């Protein structure tokens, strides 16, 4: 599901330039019902930095697609970069078919591979800063040249403050993901009371409530 965007953003941070302006194309549009969107339209102009924030904080699928097209020159080109990176870090049971994580039978991973991907991303300070954002302001220009501003809240309930971790555990941040096929998913980085880092992944929970309850049970093992 949307934990896919960890890889999307990691590649964008490695190959993209934050100040580059991206013009949204028809190829970036998402038609799937219920998909989380920034609601971009063809002709809108937005920086790579704002696409990255929208992808990670809001989990906007159209932003992730636009980001991928701008860096990979096409969705297919970017997906090839994602799969190459997965192989480089040893995530050999992973195959990406899109940059956002919406359901596709040829798009799959494992909890261990997601640990490898998140662990790789954690080496990037900008990524660490992103996953700690409680909220963000996304700024762009519509096709008529009018400035637009959208405030978004982090979908990670540990970060937005709606769920508390166990005593002594600090959740640095991570990425949520939810589809009918994948269930409720979460991959997070955390630290225990003595500062030791952990990466925790839960997939296929039957609800958001269950997901965060189970994650807290897992986090208690860190102390």
Q: What is the meaning of each model-derived region?
A:
Residues 73-223:
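Penicillin-recognizing serine hydrolase domain
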């Amino acid at each position: 599901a949307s934990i896919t965007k960890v890889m999307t953003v990691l590649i964008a941070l490695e190959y993209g330039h934050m100040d580059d302006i991206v013009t949204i194309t028809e190829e970036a549009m998402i038609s799937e019902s219920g998909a989380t969107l920034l609601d971009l339209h063809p002709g809108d102009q937005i920086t790579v930095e704002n696409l990255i924030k929208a992808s990670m904080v809001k989990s906007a699928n159209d932003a992730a697609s636009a980001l991928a097209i701008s860096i990979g020159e096409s969705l297919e080109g970017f997906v090839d970069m994602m799969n190459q990176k997965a192989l480089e870090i040893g995530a050999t049971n992973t195959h990406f078919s899109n940059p956002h994580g919406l359901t596709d039978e040829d798009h799959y991973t494992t909890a261990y591979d997601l640990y490898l991907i998140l662990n790789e991303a954690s080496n990037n300070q900008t990524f660490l800063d992103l996953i700690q954002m409680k909220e963000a302001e996304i700024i762009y220009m519509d096709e008529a040249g009018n400035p637009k501003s959208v405030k978004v809240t982090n979908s990670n309930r540990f970060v937005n403050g709606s769920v508390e971790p166990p005593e002594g555990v600090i959740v640095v941040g991570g990425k949520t993901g939810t589809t009918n096929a994948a269930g409720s998913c979460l991959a997070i980085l955390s630290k225990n009371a003595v500062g030791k880092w952990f990466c925790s992944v839960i997939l296929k929970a039957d609800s958001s409530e269950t997901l965060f309850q189970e994650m807290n049970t897992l986090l208690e093992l860190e102390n």
